[in-house]
Curated annotation (Swiss-Prot):
One of its GO terms (molecular function) is purine nucleosidase activity. This is Pyrimidine-specific ribonucleoside hydrolase RihA. Belongs to the IUNH family. RihA subfamily. It comes from Salmonella gallinarum (strain 287/91 / NCTC 13346). The gene is rihA. GO terms for cellular component: cytosol.
């Protein structure tokens, strides 16, 4: 039986590729997709979800737009990474269908209520929508199998010295998620920076030769440009968000540890930092499965294998 999932995302190049991977995988049943604000404005990320589903010929999947700003802060976007549209690079189709009239939280709640089995929530943007769901529907917590997030880091941040972008955008929301009592799986920068795509990988995807693999290659052509900055020390570009889907499909290519994680919401230098109690110093029981390593070749091979689904 396919694993039922809800994807909450803010496309974004790597979010878009996470959608491509999920919808090429019969092991997963994508029951709903909601959009969050982060990589671009809420209007643009919602439009990008619809554009990707139009490209992938999946207008059957319910879509809803989420919160327009973080719980307690003004919105920060990463247009310097993802471009003016949020998905600069390839020529994507205009949406062929409209989102649901309700909110992301309403669609998530409806999906959870109607599911015969607990649902995994995959969240690849700021945690605002998921936190709002948890706060407004405590009766549905038992319907959530786990929350798999791309966010945080044990070591270095990528938006501030201490904080990864998704968590920094809405640290209060992330703290709600981590302390919810629901199992959390964290794909942080410690692992996603190892899940790099190189120029040869992009050409491998392009050579698959179907329309979707070509679009993915063109998305990566653009995404690579930002990551060529010498300050990062990257050879390729880290594909952050697809790590969440890849973990669901092939957990054996990841190394994980069980640890307690908290989110700093007030620090002068550390707002948005995920504090991972690696050495069990706090006495707190682990609340998260934290990814710490990945077989990077296995990750690339999985993407290449699933791109052939679209032939």
């Amino acid at each position: 039986m396919a694993l039922p999932i809800i994807i909450d995302c803010d496309p974004g190049h790597d979010d878009a590729i996470a959608l491509v991977l999920a919808l090429a995988s019969p092991e997963l049943e994508v029951k709903a997709i909601t959009s969050s604000a982060g990589n671009q404005t809420p209007e643009k990320t919602l439009r990008n979800v619809l554009r990707m589903l139009t490209l992938l010929k999946r207008p059957d999947i319910p879509v809803a737009g989420g919160a327009v700003k973080p719980l307690m802060r003004e919105l920060i976007i990463a247009d310097n990474v993802h471009g003016e549209s949020g998905l600069n690079g390839p020529a994507l189709p205009e949406p062929s269908f409209a989102p649901q009239s309700g909110t992301a939280v309403e669609l998530m709640a409806k999906t959870l209520r109607e599911s015969a089995q607990p649902v995994t929530i995959v969240s690849t943007g700021p945690q605002t929508n998921v936190a709002l769901l948890l706060n407004s529907h405590p009766e549905l917590h038992t319907k959530i199998a786990r929350i798999v997030i791309m966010g945080g880091a044990m070591a270095l941040g990528n938006w501030t010295p201490a904080a990864e972008f998704n968590i920094y955008v809405d640290p209060e929301a992330a703290e709600i998620v981590f302390q919810s009592g629901i199992p959390v799986v964290m794909a942080g920068l410690d692992v996603t920076h190892k899940a790099q795509i190189h120029a040869a990988d992009i050409e491998r995807f392009r050579a698959i030769g179907n329309p979707i693999s070509t679009i993915v290659a063109e998305l990566l052509d653009f995404f690579m440009e930002y990551h060529k900055d010498e300050k990062w020390g990257f050879v390729g570009a880290p594909l952050h968000d697809p790590c969440t889907i890849a973990w669901l499909l092939k957990p054996e290519i990841f190394t994980t540890v069980e640890r307690w994680v908290g989110v700093e919401t007030k620090g002068k230098y550390t707002q948005g930092m995920t504090v991972v109690d690696y050495y069990f110093l706090t006495g707190n029981k682990p609340n998260a499965t934290v990814m710490v390593d990945v077989d990077s070749q296995g990750f690339v091979d999985l993407l290449a294998e699933r791109l052939q689904y679209y032939a």
